[in-house]
Amino acid sequence: MKVIILLLSSLISLSADQIQGRLKIALLRVSFPEGDYPGFTGSGNFLFDANDLCSNKTIDPGPHDKNFFQSQLVAVNNYFENVSYGAFGIDTTYSTIFPKNNQDSYLIDQRMNYYNELGKENDHEKRITELLKDAVVAAYARDSIDLGSFDLVAVIHPGLGQDFDLPFLDPTPEDIPSTYVDENMVNMYFKDEIRSGNSIINKGIILPESQNIAIMDEALASAINSPCDLQFSVTGTWALMIGFAIGLPPLWELDSGASGVGIFALMDQGSNNLRGIVPSRPNPWTRIYAGWEKPTII
């Protein structure tokens, strides 16, 4: 899985041996002007219709509304509570999905392929940081939300994440990559500019609506042999991005992309285990680092 990850920064009790407590997340659903974007999955808005292409074997079926994302939040909380033995989880009581209407989003006045546009590779880091800024600004402009009371801001965008090495030529290379936007990125491009009321937002994560090629783009699915074999849940992606945000170190080589421990750890390639529905546990080293396990000295 390809993920943009820069230097890690802290969030709540994030020194080694102390990743504990309940993370309160503000999840901002954003959409873009609808249109035909050949390099991007979908039309710019969320999938609100059911798609029965894979019948009762569909992973993360529509509608992708507030209720759907709430269920994903519960799933990720269950995952972290399990792997941390109850030490860490998501505050599912006070974490909030915005806007509050079930099928709604904040419309960003920017074409959606702008944030990962082909031919603009040198601008990708700035533009993905700009997406965090655009989402926060749009949410405050409409609902006057002060996000300073939350531990983490997550932006949910329509379409797939540009996160996989596909076994064929990628037909949608401008999909937005799942990203942890850290404080260094924000300070480099928009220092003190991402404001929500009286609060300055200096980090966040970018999450896709789905990782299921089969249901997200009918034209794309029809051009692929056995599209239902390319289904993945977004649960693993969400768990991985939250892992970065709480300070779990990546376990692959950042410069080359070479895997360190493979599918046996969340913070390497384990986020897509069992098609992303049941991500791999953080490996023993990571659990010790987080304070969720105690090492046995022999």
Give the location of each predicted region.
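Sec-dependent N-terminal signal peptides
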Residues: K2-I12
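N-terminal module-boundary/linker segments of secreted carbohydrate-active enzymes
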Residues: S15-N67, K133
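Structured segments of extracytoplasmic/periplasmic soluble domains
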Residues: P33, D49, L53-N56, Y79-N82, ...
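Loop/turn elements at helix/coil->beta-strand transitions in domains of secreted/extracellular proteins
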Residues: G21-A26, D146-V153, G262-I263
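Short, flexible beta-strand-to-coil junctions
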Residues: L11-L14, S31-P33, H157-D165
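Active-site-proximal segments of metallohydrolase catalytic domains
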Residues: N67-I215, A219
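Short consensus segments that form the blades of beta-propeller domains
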Residues: D17-Q18, D146, S256-A258
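Extracellular hydrolytic enzyme modules, especially secreted metalloproteases
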Residues: L152-A154, P158-I298
